């Protein structure tokens, strides 16, 4: 089983578990206050301070709601939509920063507070979206003279209200609130179980780590009795599954990884699925999947199924061909093998690349030290998006390891980004990007944060990264740039990447393609010991190796998408998590299922993306189509870069996703470029 996509960014929606579009009340200046009291982590970072900070924001939110309701008719944009947007600001920033503390705060009491406060804020958000008086006031606003962005904002807001059940009777609205509050609490517990209770694998001696890189072994010294403890964090899991020669070790790690938070999260998941289904039914939908897609580009669960089937047809033959090639290779090396187990996939793909493409994935790691990769990301983004980055050493941060960077467009300060990039005890284990402050044109600068778990960050550790980690870094950084460049709207509710959720991954997935270009890579990839620039022939072989397995990757994404859908398109009393897992796994993976796999207990996307994991597949199609518009001989300097910034990123959420696609491509997306991308490994054109 491949890993689900690392990104977890979500937009504001009542369907989202957490309202994390990060909306903040306007400040009198658009410069950064170095001791900004509006950030929850500034000052004394303890539970009482966090609780007071959130309480203050909730009080301001209520003041804006009262202002809206007290306004005299006629209802106007300024006396109704403006205070509504300000109320959302207060809820948004409170929810975003409370959840941020839940995910990254070094102090356990602050993480505990973040969890409780995130639930409290989501409850307030539910109350706002079930308030009929607010809905009627918004619906009465005269939009005849409104600009297109304001009209789009209002239309989408009213749709979200209807999807929340505002037009239902009092009893139904009360039940919806009860359901929403329950889901929020359960989802937070699901995430907390993953965050604070990772599984471990213990090896008896260093010999069991045969095949692992020397720096990995050095970073895992044995205990007094000689045993070595490995975690299921990405920094341990991925190297073990890729390089360990021991089948037994890989199998134990695989099962440890796919049983994280089991059985506790199994019961939580079943409870959430039941509650979502019941909520969808009282809102008039056949299933939660139908409710969850009603405000998306895809439009309906039926459209989602049709799209996934179309991609399945396009990718299945190549995926099976890849597996046959891999199995034939494995049989040459290990006569008698009848199938490649799930825990052998990454190992055999790496071995295949070494022989077929003369590419050892360990050979590029010395060229990708964390510090140089970070600088390379900043330099590449600066050239591509026509911005610059300057350190902000005086910016308050929640941990000394976090760095802050100011973003400039020419001489104009346009935003700030925070990088929290290395593992810590109690910190979220995944890779994600989130807004921290939404931009409001002329009033407020946008801020965003990267939460990752890459190697490095410790004295003496150069932080050697795998190529896939480098690509992930640029992917997540793309979300930050979307938040900054799209954060110049008049309304906080449509700023940054507050588009439909099933568009939000497309810009970042497109950026992944840039890091196959030799010129871009060689600008920063240098050997940490010799300072040698990454050789072009090594890049060519790396690109050939990375092109192999694309169709299988797509099939893996279809598995995650289909499993997410299958858990949300039927009555909960018919759901058997393990039976559906086995069925969907067998449909999309040729690798035999490993008994004991309970991956759903660690599949956090089921909480945030609910039924809509298909987002990653749809957005990959869009991303590859976008990339096809760039001049491959001048990726950073061609005309497409600025045109892309203007057409796709700068509008933020002020336009529908379909309009953003058409604006850049001149047409709707199609599968043509995607099919060529999948077929590249068989055309011998990887470069």
Pin down the residues of each PLM region:
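N-terminal secretory signal peptides that target proteins for export/translocation
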Residues: 1-13
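Bacterial N-terminal signal peptides
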Residues: 13-29
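N-terminal helix-rich structural modules
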Residues: 34-213, 229, 630, 687
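C-terminal, non-catalytic "cap/extension" segments appended to globular domains
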Residues: 34-48, 52, 56, 227, ...
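Short His/Asp/Glu-rich catalytic/ion-coordination signatures at enzyme active sites or charged loops
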Residues: 37-49, 97-117, 139-178, 231-266, ...
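Short, hydrophobic/amphipathic alpha-helical patches that form generic packing surfaces
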Residues: 89-100, 155, 159, 255, ...
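Active-site-proximal, well-structured secondary-structure segments within enzyme catalytic domains
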Residues: 153, 185, 192, 197-231, ...
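Short pre-active-site segment immediately N-terminal to the catalytic Zn-binding motif
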Residues: 455-474
